[in-house]
Amino acid sequence: MSQPVQTFTPQAFHRQAHDALENPQIRANFRKAMDGLMGKRRKAFDDWDLETLRELGANIRLRALSKLPDLLEQLEANCEANGIRVHWAENGEQACAMITEICQQHGASSVIKGKSMVSEEMHLNAHLEQAGIEALESDLGEYLVQLNEQTPSHIIMPAIHLNTGEISDIMHERTGTERTTDVDAMTAAARAQLRERFMTADVGVSGVNFAVAETGTLCLVENEGNGRLTTTAPPVHIAVTGIEKVVEHLADVPPLYALLTRSATGQHVTTYFNMISSPRKADEHDGPEEVHL
């Protein structure tokens, strides 16, 4: 039977770290996943001069940093002109309060979440739950660790510490699915469980990979399609990001995207690349009625 990990605290970190390092199953799970990921990453840069691309990406980021106050104002102005409502928070606690307030204004009882590391850092789920709002992760790895009452163990692969058998046990124990080691079958079962939740959620919460000041566009990189559903199916979409994600021009995105996909998952392109510039317009049949940043 799968067991939830303890909540990590600064006081207990050393003991918990030693416990994890001494667990041969966790070490084997990490090694298998990381060996595969690093191999894919090396191959993904075969058609690129990595150092040149890295230098280009660094220059784009440094240029944005040198103009950051102006770019943030430009981003806000263009987002607002597009119909995206912009909110500023000084810290995670303020951001959680703002997001909770937006949900409450819409009478929301359920939130579906795309992958967002900043929301993890803010402990957004706990804040929403304290307000009586259910928050469900839709990224497959995040969904699995949430089912097992854990937190993500890796920024790209949240469930990297779990192997196929452990995942099968979690899904069987928490959702009643049949035990299987067939990855496709487990993925299909999770997809079926999540699909209805996308359609019935009151609010969708996502992260942001790039926020383009020039156009007021929010870019979201993903592979599972959950990001697109999170940002289009619920009537309200809330995008959560730190100020470091802003870039000046739309033309700055492709080189950063090339670096991101190859470095993160060893892919030339991800399955989905979403560009969000407004809520649903009068002549459109789908998309959220409100978008908040």
Regions from the PLM with identified roles:
Residues 1-293:
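The feature marks the mature, well-folded catalytic cores of soluble enzymes
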